[in-house]
């Protein structure tokens, strides 16, 4: 980690012995910016020249005051290069403002038939949010929610069931096994309230109608026509449904905008340093620590940021995608899916949930606490993801998933169980941390249409691997259902899915070498993808009698559009 701010400032802000005058001025100038090679955080943009005059004594005092701010301290920025003789160059120009907000009265607002003043938080996005035009976002009633993990699991996973009997499917389209759908998850109400407060917008202003004007682009519609637009909305509605301010690392455009509206000279100088060439390392480190706009506004409290200018630089709030965990043909007009709640460490301490998973967690808890009449804002999309378009109705298959990545394979198994001759040709490699706490859909793989209960008897037999506590389970009789192998890691010598792929290499190779065999992979990219693909290469080397280079090339060939024997969905 970088040295603490207090240490860096004390050492670097005091006048240098080589400086003849204690009132030397900071200098800032700009030129073309190359950006950061490591994180690619700074695209080439127009730059400007600027001079910032600040006496060293005044700067020292104000830095001391700034360092008392606990949020500023939590950023732990390395400001060692920021001293009285600094020359700041390659500072981006202030982003142009392409948005305006004009207050209007309610009578004028009612002229827009789509505008509604909500006395309670709206459950659905405004009409102009169109992720799949010309179709609107659909309020799918939530039929059921259950928690798939048990207390003590590292991550919580919830299962949802949605009623889509009234969904306006276009003629000739259907819900497909392996398909995915979009959820229009809003920003958390508490985060929106906090941001409004930091922007000095009171509740009456937040909910008052405004006329939004844009110079062009698709925002705030997502995918509507790229054109200038005027529409009636509210400030709260825009922050809740149309912009990302919690889940995207800050870009230099945003930092530069904060600097422009900082009333305190020292705060402005720190912000300019972060977007300068010399501050590149500090900027990249800042982006790596889950810093949000709210954190920055707390760390630099003198910033008086206008909402219209802020909306120009914030990215569009995009839909979150979830894979179906059931076969829609078997479960008529019901869509099922699972979601892992993502918890993110906050730089100032504590955790926060992800945008999509946090929204779904809040809905799940409300349902489990007895609340009904809940809906999920969702839409079908194109159903063009790899699993939906390349599901195989026959032939042997290996389904490899870790954590919630195994959920779409439940739908695969449901479909294959409708054909008794195909059921035993399916092998599910199911990775989890602890089978007792976080094995998903426990007891449902032999009959996925029947929900499990805590006292369900397992039809699997546990066998020990080379490590004392790591075990897998494999169904004894694979003729009447899928062969379900659970790989769990509970000891210091972890066993992962890739270990079981090697252990069962003969089975995996029998699928890969079959003319109609397919291997499906689903899970997180970090660690999991490389581990599984290395294991598949090892299987090809051992059982296919290939060199490692040949096996690597063969795996790539199996992923080509003309072959598609190996199909993956990775996030």
Curated annotation (Swiss-Prot):
Its cofactor is FAD. Transmembrane segments: none annotated. One of its GO terms (biological process) is homocysteine metabolic process. Pfam families: FAD_binding_1 (PF00667), NAD_binding_1 (PF00175). Residues 135-389 form the FAD-binding FR-type domain. Coiled coil: none annotated. InterPro entries: CysJ-like_FAD-binding, FAD-bd_FR_type, Flavoprot_Pyr_Nucl_cyt_Rdtase, FNR_nucleotide-bd, NADPH_Cyt_P450_Rdtase_alpha, OxRdtase_FAD/NAD-bd, Riboflavin_synthase-like_b-brl. One of its GO terms (molecular function) is [methionine synthase] reductase (NADPH) activity. Residues 1-25, 447-479 are annotated as: Disordered. GO terms for cellular component: cytosol. The keyword Oxidoreductase applies. Keywords: FAD, Flavoprotein, Oxidoreductase. Belongs to the flavoprotein pyridine nucleotide cytochrome reductase family. PANTHER family: METHIONINE SYNTHASE REDUCTASE, NITRIC OXIDE SYNTHASE-RELATED. This is Uncharacterized FAD-binding protein C12C2.03c. It comes from Schizosaccharomyces pombe (strain 972 / ATCC 24843). The lineage of its organism: Eukaryota, Fungi, Dikarya, Ascomycota, Taphrinomycotina.
